[in-house]
């Protein structure tokens, strides 16, 4: 089998994770930590791309990586327009939306730009894979009870789809032939109904749907939320933080560290026990609801993400949902590996690269 060498780039707010893979095998994985004062000099996140590019190239050189031997560069997908899942070739339309922050400004927008900047000089393809804006929801799933307020698809697409493919392989099937309920449990929690390779429904794990998580509130009583918003006690930004960042375990028990909460549970703390069980309860309830989306025809329930390492949490969830289907646990996430595998599927011609297309009617982002 021929070897495809792939450079993978995953930018964060103050760091850039890079990996070099020979097919599925990691040759190099490194987290480059950027000096906050240095990156603070740039007015916009997007202006950091040249600085980050040079830093990446220096690190590769220091490890003896000859970039002329690369077959492709793959970056983390950013805040683009809603697109279906898959591996996309970075093109001019995508670069424009990433640079302009069409759907928002985030460090992940640098992924496609950095991939393109490095790849174009080597005359090799640049890709992104399954960004958070992956949207494969069916029309019926978009309807909410307020006109003009559509439900949105924002979830852990990269890890959910990567793990779903692994599970399909373990079951000796193609991802596109199975119905799976995939639950990513990390700082946020998302439950996706995967129908024959498409995530036809999923809770918006970013800002206000589904189970509460270590730092997100999830679905809350709407009437009480409205009263809180108009109480005069909070600014808008404070309310957003209550939903994202200071919600969930942070609000209820004062920490987003699930390990600390587990230690409290093991010591018999009644409040910690109730709250941790409540999080598992809400995850199980979301899985149960998603099973109805697939008419109960489920090949497997998959638990993944950092919290899937928690035996207490996993056992609580299993106890409530294992009557629906077998529960398969794949703890953690490996974004670099997932990106490399997405690029590799295209290089091996197992799937065709997708094209990012901007349609005339899409003058504003869904957001």
UniProtKB/Swiss-Prot annotation:
Superkingdom classification of source: Bacteria
PROSITE patterns: ACETATE_KINASE_1 (PS01075), ACETATE_KINASE_2 (PS01076)
Entry GO terms, CC: cytoplasm
Catalytic activity: butanoate + ATP = butanoyl phosphate + ADP
UniProt xrefs under CDD domains: ASKHA_NBD_BK (cd24011)
Entry's EC annotation: 2.7.2.7
Top EC class for this record: transferase
GO molecular function: acetate kinase activity; ATP binding; butyrate kinase activity
Cited InterPro entries: Aliphatic_acid_kin_short-chain (IPR000890), Aliphatic_acid_kinase_CS (IPR023865), ATPase_NBD (IPR043129), Butyrate_kin (IPR011245)
Keywords for this protein: ATP-binding, Cytoplasm, Kinase, Nucleotide-binding, Transferase
Membership in a protein family: Belongs to the acetokinase family.
Protein name stated in the entry: Probable butyrate kinase
Gene that this polypeptide is encoded by: buk
